[in-house]
Amino acid sequence: MDKTVAVKWMQDFDQKVETEKDHLSELDGPLGDGDHGANLARGMAAAIEAIKSTEPQSAAEVFKAVSMALISKVGGASGPLYGSAFMGMMKAEQAGQDLAGVLEAGLEMIKKRGHAQAGEKTMVDVWHPVVEAVKQGQLTNDVIDQAVLSTKEVAATKGRASYVGERSIGHIDPGSYSSGLLFKALLEAEE
């Protein structure tokens, strides 16, 4: 990925998170601590500052700066999960992987860090179909929206949301929603 596309992607994601931070926290209320939006907004603001201060020379360096900022600034599960994803993406980018390979490396790191699989009402439920769509050259906003909405009718079995079990049905997973924002930002950055 070109460095300028990676930077634009992260800037677009930061803007989307900032715009939707209250909604993200509302989604997190019934399932978690109600702070996903505020935490992720703080982390992405730090990530953008890190990009500016480190002046990355490659997409891999952009992903590294984002990873380190999210791990250090975002509490709860989302910081380590997103941070791990971007670290995996950095390594795949350094290895010359294409976009599908880079995103798949991010997905694998999320699965490893969170011990999660598809169908458990986690970020994996968005990352997995997005990776498959990218492999087919068919990633669209509709694919992203369908993946996010798929988490609504599933009972959470992983993470903080699993504590409410069946009562999590009817609620969109906040990490899935923010992942949807990440991939919509990717589509915009690639235009």
Protein language model regions, located:
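N-terminal loops that bind phosphate or other acidic moieties
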Residues: 1-191
